[in-house]
């Protein structure tokens, strides 16, 4: 595939779904995010997303903005999304990446979300 997150970001795309969050550090906080877990969803349901498939191939659907990883993670934690995907992503992160999420949360007055029992082992 060869694309990196910054390449997609320059194109104005948001990457979504478990693989994109883990591999690229970018994702969407839109309500349609759960659709990005599936390879066979019709394109009209994905309007505005970049779908990264499990096999590494991708489909770009235009018209989205990008979010840096700390913002994407905080946004995900606020929405009703698959907690296991978030935990899986946090498990893959370095201490510096976890710290960047903490810093972003403090700067944006979102520290309260980090105190949630679901994330306590990471931000405790």
Q: What kind of region is each of these model predictions?
A:
Residues 100-124:
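Structured mid-to-C-terminal alpha-helical surface segments
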Residues 1-68, 75, 79-80, 84-108:
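Short gly/ser-rich loop at a beta-strand->alpha-helix junction or flexible surface loop bordering the NTP-binding
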């Amino acid at each position: 595939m060869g694309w990196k997150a910054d390449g997609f970001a320059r194109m104005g795309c948001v990457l979504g779904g478990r693989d994109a969050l883990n591999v690229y550090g970018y994702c969407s906080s839109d309500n349609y995010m759960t659709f990005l877990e599936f390879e066979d969803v019709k394109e009209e349901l994905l309007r505005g997303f970049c779908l990264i498939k499990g096999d590494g191939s991708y489909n770009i659907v235009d018209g989205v903005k990008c979010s840096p990883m700390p913002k994407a993670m905080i946004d995900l934690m606020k929405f009703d999304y698959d907690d296991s995907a978030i935990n899986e992503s946090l498990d893959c992160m370095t201490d510096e990446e976890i710290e960047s999420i903490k810093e972003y949360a403090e700067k944006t007055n979102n520290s309260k979300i980090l105190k949630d029992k679901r994330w306590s082992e990471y931000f405790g």
